[in-house]
Amino acid sequence: MLGPLRKEHPIFRILNSTFVDLPLPSNLSIWWNFGSLLGLCLITQILTGLFLAMHYTADISLAFSSASHICRDVNYGWLLRNVHANGASLFFICMYCHIGRGLYYGGSNKIETWNVGVILFLVTVLTAFVGYVLVWGRMSFWAATVIANLVTAVPCVGTTIVQWLWGGFSVDNATLTRFFAFHFLFPFIIAALAIIDLVFLHNSGANNPVGLNSNYDKAPFHIYYTTKDTVGFIALIAALFVLALLFPCALNDPENFIPANPLSHPPHIQPEWYFLFAYAILRSIPNKLGGVIALVAAILVLFLMPLLNTSKNESNSFRPLSQATFWILVATFFVLTWIGSQPVEQPFVLIGQIASLLYFSLFIFGFPLVSSLENKMIFS
């Protein structure tokens, strides 16, 4: 007698084991929704980006005009652009929440899954950066010039890499063309990495809020967690359309509505809001090479989390000192984001330097030392 098609068909069997019969801990909270929300954001970005690419022209004399043409002349082009631009912001909000949940509940202990996730985050950052340049507004142009020029700080090969990246000695037509190619390609790499991340996650099993072994109490993904994820989908789509329809420019830089001009730069050059924390860390180091190293380390430090973990408990749920350390890190992240949006002058420079030092100290010394102290308090 044949079983259900979802269990017999070779393709449906894979989907069934991933989205239907997957056994999960029965006590997962709303913080576990962000993985599926990231998947929804990625699909939305790929679909809207595909339609935008049909009307966009990757040429410095036409890029700004083609972006304007999409909003003015293409049917629902304004909606596509607003959803795509604000979808990127929601993508990063979900990603930061997802990373925060991993840090708080011990997801960083699953080394392969965590490392693939950090690589995914890096590729997403690159995708957003090259996409920001495509509008060819004044802030986009100077962000591409200033941020890419930082690579020249790399000894020996830095200048060569920048010239290859720019396609010449300055940001020009070749730069825009290759950035458009990268921006079109990277989302599919992100999708592939997301599948690899899922494979590792299903191999190691999901953690849970209390950090205990959940093999004795599992629930199937469908219908319990599909329903829960659907609630998250509705909330995310509602938030996206509120932004896209009512406040489409709330998270955009006004300088980007001015066409790019190599002879005129904005009074304060800054990236999009979701990169401001790293930009603040970059600015807090007076040396160019040191700033670039700090900028890269701000993300790469996440790779150290599984190696620096000293706790005997997986989750922070029953560890008040680790909870306090985590929320200090979150507060530091918000302070750095605020500092990144401020001009380079006192007292913002000093606050940025203190927050940057605290950011790295919490990752490298704070969490391991606090976890060791809690081990002694609880288990000795």
Curated annotation (Swiss-Prot):
Membrane topology: Multi-pass membrane protein
PROSITE patterns listed in its UniProt record: CYTB_CTER, CYTB_NTER
Cofactors named for this entry: heme b
Membrane-spanning intervals of the chain: 34-54, 78-99, 114-134, 179-199, 227-247, 289-309, 321-341, 348-369
Function summary: Component of the ubiquinol-cytochrome c reductase complex (complex III or cytochrome b-c1 complex) that is part of the mitochondrial respiratory chain. The b-c1 complex mediates electron transfer from ubiquinol to cytochrome c. Contributes to the generation of a proton gradient across the mitochondrial membrane that is then used for ATP synthesis.
Further remarks about this protein from its record: Heme 1 (or BL or b562) is low-potential and absorbs at about 562 nm, and heme 2 (or BH or b566) is high-potential and absorbs at about 566 nm.
Name of this chain's protein: Cytochrome b
